[in-house]
């Protein structure tokens, strides 16, 4: 059986491709760099900035309540999408440091058990991809069908344009072309903004599991220096914590890698995740209110059903892997006592106890310094949406 090649960076390829199309990967472009910078400026001015603006100007100025609600939900989503994209673009070079730390951790992977753990990552991230495809496809389909089955000339999303698109066929096609191209651009932004945190948190979980395995093997091989192995694992752990944001030496080294990696990732995804939690609660509430009280057209109802389901599913993978991170970080001190520590010298035991004290500190990714990226926050977001919905019910009474 062929040996699994460990390369965590392969899971970043689709994100770098997306960032390149979005115009934020200029430092990775070697040819036609000036042209790429021009493309980046124009595309982000026309879409990242102007797309939410052309939706926002039309807020509560539309012909029907259904159009007002569609306009509001799309405006909130696109605004959040643009802000998240700009935050990621501002900190994009941090991804290079994450990749450097991941390479160091990949080099530490040895043995069939650790490679088997890495092999499971492909399955998990493929399932994440299926979740996002399942989110986007029905919403896009019913948004398009709702647009096509309109009885009179209209836009895909209610919005403002500086020209008369209603009475001019040419302007009508220009407006719709802009909306279709713009929403495709924003969907790509949304994919990379929502998928990247899930991917990096999944990678952290897998590397923590592999570190756990390396801890258990410390001191079992008499031919290896147990103290150096332990130090290497501790260094790996520190690198992982920073990124999110012989045997003893290697274990300590791994511990340090984990610490650095985790802190780096947490800093990178913190504000975008806070924005996503807030917008999810708001849009789930609006979508439910639209279904119950306002929208009667069949296609529009189907759109809001899938939209209300899609919003929480966008944050679920990140919350799931954030919970998995916390669980495995919390078990590392058990792994330390699972190794062959009782036969080692005093220096080994001193370093191991130092590691145990460090690993007892809770390591949880936090969004905006306030909300844990955790399943508890996922359910709290749904509760927040329900609370807003009950306020709407009381206001109607």
Curated annotation (Swiss-Prot):
Main location: membrane
Any GO molecular function: ionotropic olfactory receptor activity
Tissues showing expression: Expressed in neurons of the third antennal segment.
Record membrane topology: Multi-pass membrane protein
InterPro entries referenced in this protein's UniProt entry, alphabetically: 7tm6_olfct_rcpt
Glycosylated residues, chain numbering: 62
UniProt entry keywords in alphabetical sequence: Cell membrane, Glycoprotein, Membrane, Olfaction, Receptor, Sensory transduction, Transducer, Transmembrane, Transmembrane helix
Spans within the Extracellular topological domain: 58-68, 150-179, 296-301, 394-397
Residue stretches spanning the membrane: 37-57, 69-92, 129-149, 180-200, 275-295, 302-322, 373-393
Annotated localization: Cell membrane
Side of membrane Cytoplasmic, spans: 1-36, 93-128, 201-274, 323-372
Assigned GO CC terms: dendrite membrane; membrane; plasma membrane
GO biological process: detection of chemical stimulus involved in sensory perception of smell; sensory perception of smell; signal transduction
Record text on subunit structure and interactions: Interacts with Orco. Complexes exist early in the endomembrane system in olfactory sensory neurons (OSNs), coupling these complexes to the conserved ciliary trafficking pathway.
Function, in words: Odorant receptor which mediates acceptance or avoidance behavior, depending on its substrates. The odorant receptor repertoire encodes a large collection of odor stimuli that vary widely in identity, intensity, and duration. May form a complex with Orco to form odorant-sensing units, providing sensitive and prolonged odorant signaling and calcium permeability. Involved in the behavioral responses to ethyl acetate, anisole, hexanoic acid, and pyrazines.
Family: Belongs to the insect chemoreceptor superfamily. Heteromeric odorant receptor channel (TC 1.A.69) family. Or2a subfamily.
Other facts: The atypical heteromeric and topological design of the odorant receptors appears to be an insect-specific solution for odor recognition, making the OR/Orco complex an attractive target for the development of highly selective insect repellents to disrupt olfactory-mediated host-seeking behaviors of insect disease vectors. Odor-evoked OR currents are independent of known G-protein-coupled second messenger pathways.
Name of the featured protein: Odorant receptor 59a
Protein source organism: Drosophila melanogaster (Fruit fly)
Gene coding for it: Or59a
């Amino acid at each position: 059986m062929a040996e699994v090649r460990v390369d965590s960076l392969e899971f970043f390829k689709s994100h770098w491709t997306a960032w390149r199309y979005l115009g934020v990967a200029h430092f990775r472009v070697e040819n036609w760099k000036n042209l790429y910078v021009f493309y980046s400026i124009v595309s982000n001015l026309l879409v990242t900035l102007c797309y939410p603006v052309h939706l926002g100007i039309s807020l509560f100025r539309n012909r029907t309540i259904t159009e007002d609600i569609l306009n509001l939900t799309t405006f909130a989503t696109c605004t959040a999408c643009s802000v998240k994209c700009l935050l990621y673009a501002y900190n994009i070079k941090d991804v290079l440091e994450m990749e450097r730390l991941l390479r160091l951790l990949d080099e530490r992977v040895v043995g069939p058990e650790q490679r088997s753990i890495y092999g499971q990552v492909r399955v998990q991230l493929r399932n994440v991809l299926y979740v996002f495809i399942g989110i986007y496809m029905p919403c896009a389909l019913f948004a398009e069908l709702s647009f096509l089955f309109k009885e009179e000339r209209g836009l895909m999303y209610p919005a403002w344009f500086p020209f008369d698109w209603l009475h001019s066929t040419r302007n009508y096609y220009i407006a719709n072309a802009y909306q279709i191209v713009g929403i495709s651009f924003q969907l790509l932004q949304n994919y990379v903004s929502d998928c990247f945190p899930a991917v990096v948190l999944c990678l952290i979980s897998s590397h923590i599991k592999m570190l756990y395995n390396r801890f258990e093997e410390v001191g079992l091989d008499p031919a290896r220096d147990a103290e150096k192995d332990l130090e290497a694992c501790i260094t790996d752990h520190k690198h992982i914590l920073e990124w999110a944001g012989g045997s003893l030496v290697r274990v300590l080294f791994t511990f340090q890698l984990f610490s650095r990696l985790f802190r780096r990732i947490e800093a990178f995804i913190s504000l975008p995740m806070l924005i996503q939690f807030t917008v999810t609660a708001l849009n789930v509430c609006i979508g439910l209110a639209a279904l119950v009280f306002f929208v009667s057209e069949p296609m529009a109802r189907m759109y809001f059903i899938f939209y209300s389901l899609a919003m929480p599913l966008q944050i679920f993978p990140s919350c799931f892997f954030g919970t998995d991170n916390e669980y495995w970080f919390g078990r590392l001190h058990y792994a330390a006592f699972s190794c062959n520590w009782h036969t080692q010298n005093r220096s080994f035991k001193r370093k191991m106890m130092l590691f145990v004290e460090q690993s007892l500190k809770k390591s949880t990714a936090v969004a905006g310094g306030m909300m844990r990226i955790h399943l508890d926050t996922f359910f709290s977001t749904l509760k927040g949406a329900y609370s807003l919905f009950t306020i709407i019910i009381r206001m109607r009474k």
